[in-house]
Amino acid sequence: MNKYVISLGLIISSAASFASEPGPAAPDQPPAVKKPFPHIAWRSDDGQSSLDIGGALRVNYRDEHWDTTENNGRFLFDTFRLDVQATHKQLFSDVGYWFQDDGKRSIDRGYVGYRFNTNSNVQLGAPFKPFGLEPYPQFGWSYHIPFFMGYGVSAGTGLKYSYKDKDWDLQLGYFPRMLPSGIRYSPEVGRYSDLDDNAVAFTQSRQDNEKRNQVNARVARTFTGDGWKTEIGASLAAAELYNATTRDDGDYWAGGVHAIVNAGNWTVTSQAIRYEYDPENPDGVSNDSVLMGGNGLTPAYLIASKATIGSINVGYDIFTPSLGQLKKIKVYNDYSRMMKDKSGWDDSQMFTVGAQFLAMPIMAWVDFTWAKNANPFGGAENGTGWTNTNSVGSNDWYYRTNINIGYYF
């Protein structure tokens, strides 16, 4: 009976069936590159102060191959993003503000910082939480499993210290609270009362957990040789998991290892993540899953409380000096897998093959993605994909074509 109640609740929510996703930002351009209109850049005469205002305007084409979707070959507005960066002597700031589809807004990062020297600084506000591959856990436009579990482009309100030289990269963070759900760019564990505008009451209304007092640590070492460079790193995160119903604190922790290998035109990135949530739920609420959500751009969803995630991404750069404005094409394969602890909850998998075209200020991604037991793929048909795989489309592979075109300034 529970299976059919869950399915009914998810079908009700299918109107929002993951039609949108945040999508990654553009790669950083060298400071010497003059950015196009309407980019604003100002430097003081003494070089002690600066202001840069840039951003992007993007549209998205999506063709999804499952019954409940409305995106059967549709061009839609994706985002208008503003990036504001400023410096004054040792002080600096960085804010990314997104105007997204369906009238949503989000902040992917927003902080002020103080630079102690060329190697170390501290950031206060909403910096990225240091963990694993940074900032994006894949090459393609289509986010993969680590992102949906909260391990990619994830900011929190707090403080971060960073030290980086040619060999070492050390980051330490403390985040008393997560970003408010209404402006989250990336998903995070949340209470139903904060996510109820885009959640399913049948299955999620008693979910009342949120993370508090999270600490993060990430350390990476870079090794270089003749024509190659490799980064190897490890990450840890831990937090209280406060339940507003019981007023008790559960626990959360995660650990990960990652590697980035560059050799010629090839880049290979990989990571393994182990996470565990131990909630203090009231009687009658299962501890096997917790609720996650963002700003409502996609529906809130349950994830397995304990799981292991693995991913590997392979990219190859093709430089095109004879093709005019088109300077580079990156082709890539992204693969990720989520292995849940609970018996009978089958693995979730995602696989993307695609290409990124850099003809700045125009940039485009073309992604072909297959996914199994992954909520964004299949919508209500696959709505329990991150947990018990009891939806109509569980253990079926779903396919999506996505083309994103943006003007970056």
How does the language model describe each region?
Residues V5-L8, S14-R58, F409:
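N-terminal periplasmic/intermembrane-space "pro-region" immediately following the signal or transit peptide
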Residues H39-S186, A220-T224, S311, V366-F368, ...:
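Outer membrane beta-barrel
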Residues L51-L57, S93, V122-L124, L170-L172, ...:
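Transmembrane beta-strands of outer-membrane beta-barrel proteins
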Residues N60-W66, W98-D102, F131-L133, Q138, ...:
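Sequence/structural signature of outer-membrane beta-barrel proteins
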Residues S181-R206, A244-T246, D278-Y301, N375-N395:
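Solvent-exposed loop segments that connect transmembrane elements
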Residues R212, T222-D341, Y407:
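Detector for outer-membrane/organellar transmembrane beta-barrel domains
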Residues I312-V314, G393-F409:
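Outer-membrane beta-barrel "beta-signal"
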